[in-house]
Each structure stands twice: as structure tokens, then as C-alpha cells.
Amino acid sequence: MLKWIVRGVAALLALFLLYQLWIFGHIVYWKWNNPATTAFMDEQQARLAETNPDAELRYRWVDYGRISPQLKRAIVASEDAKFLQHEGFDWEGIQTAWEKNLQKGRIVAGGSTISQQLAKNLFLSSRRTPWRKAEEALITVMLEAVMDKRRIFEIYLNVIEWGDGVFGAESAARHYYRVPASRLSAGQAAKLAAMVPNPRYYDTHRNDRTLLRKTKIIQRRMNFVAIP
């Protein structure tokens, strides 16, 4: 009996390690090649297909140099002001988010860095479970070990959700403002950054008071952050 238990545990461990190697292999490949899709994109494609089998995501990759510096600053100011300083985890930000959530009695702040958000988007589902958070941490370590900050940020800007079926800076710029990502103004960039936490809602509530208030805050902060 004990022998079978040991074999079962060994088999599970082997599968776990193989899965991590599969993820690591993709990260190494994406260091030089652009992702065609992500786990989160696939999840949203399936959701849209439930009501419209012909639905397609709006996703267009653009190189880092073709994305407005205004948007880069706005995203860092909004999502991860210490992006260039940490190695994947902002422990002070995590503690602050934890305290806010305890105070409110519900999840109102995440504390996830740009690297953590990218890890989740590339490989994981949107379900919140302890396993997913642990796997997200492992993937974040891999991303930071393999890629430099510029590449992490380039992929992030191209794959995050910015509306219902809208992914990446280029598609978002054209969807909301009918301009390429390279031509976004400071105000437009700040508003796009403010939408990131809840993009599908803000896609249909573009004059929401909370969104407009956060946009102004980001505009005040964005010129004081460093970007890759």
C-alpha cells in the first residue's frame, strides 16, 4: 500500500515538474517571439462564442517603440509604480492591499505587479484560488528570471484586456479613440490606464465618475514614474 502511495506522489510530482517546464519553455520562446494568444484571451473568446459563434477578439500586436510613452507612464503610475525597482513582487503594495481588503471585508485591492498580472494573463484562468495564486508566483519568478523589464512590459501592453473582446494597446487606442497607440495623448493614456482593473464595465460606462476621478489622479502621477 505504501509503495503505491509513494508511486502516486512521485507521478504527481513528475507531472507538476513537466507542467512547470512547459511554462518555462514558453517564456523562453516568448523572450524573442510574440504571443499569438494567451490563456485569458482563449477564455474570453470562448465566453463570446457562447452568444456569437463568429465573434472575434480585437488584438493587434505592435512593437514597444510604437506605443506612446504617455501610455507607458500612465500604466506604470496606475498599476505598478515600483515596476523598475522590484523583482516581480511589491511586498509593500501587497501588504497595503491586504490591509484594505481586511478593512472593507472584501477584495477591493489586489496588489499585483505588472509581472504578476502578465503571468496570470499568459497562462492562468480568471478563477481566484490558492493554487492559482501560488502558480502565478512561480510564473512571475520565471518571467523576471528570463526577460528584462522592457520585454515584460512590451508583452503586457500588448495582451491585457481593454474592453469586451479588446486586447492590447493598439486595439484599445483604435477602439476608444480611433488613433494608433503611438499617437495617444496624455489624457487618453490616463483614461485607458484607469480602465485596466475593470475594462469590460468601463467599455460601456466611459463617463463613470470613478473612472474619471481615477483618470485625473493618474494624470497627476504619470510624469513622476520611470519606464523601461
UniProtKB/Swiss-Prot annotation:
The keyword Glycoprotein does not apply. Peptidoglycan polymerase that catalyzes glycan chain elongation from lipid-linked precursors. It catalyses: [GlcNAc-(1->4)-Mur2Ac(oyl-L-Ala-gamma-D-Glu-L-Lys-D-Ala-D-Ala)](n)-di-trans,octa-cis-undecaprenyl diphosphate + beta-D-GlcNAc-(1->4)-Mur2Ac(oyl-L-Ala-gamma-D-Glu-L-Lys-D-Ala-D-Ala)-di-trans,octa-cis-undecaprenyl diphosphate = [GlcNAc-(1->4)-Mur2Ac(oyl-L-Ala-gamma-D-Glu-L-Lys-D-Ala-D-Ala)](n+1)-di-trans,octa-cis-undecaprenyl diphosphate + di-trans,octa-cis-undecaprenyl diphosphate + H(+). This is Biosynthetic peptidoglycan transglycosylase. It is an enzyme of class 2 (transferase). One of its GO terms (cellular component) is peptidoglycan-based cell wall. The gene is mtgA. It is found in: Cell inner membrane. Keywords: Cell inner membrane, Cell membrane, Cell shape, Cell wall biogenesis/degradation, Glycosyltransferase, Membrane, Peptidoglycan synthesis, Transferase, Transmembrane, Transmembrane helix. Pathway: Cell wall biogenesis; peptidoglycan biosynthesis. The chain crosses the membrane at residues 8-28. It is a single-pass membrane protein. Its EC number is 2.4.99.28. The lineage of its organism: Bacteria, Pseudomonadati, Pseudomonadota, Betaproteobacteria, Neisseriales. It comes from Laribacter hongkongensis (strain HLHK9). InterPro entries: Glyco_trans_51, Lysozyme-like_dom_sf, PBP_transglycosylase, Pep_trsgly. The keyword Cell division does not apply. Belongs to the glycosyltransferase 51 family.
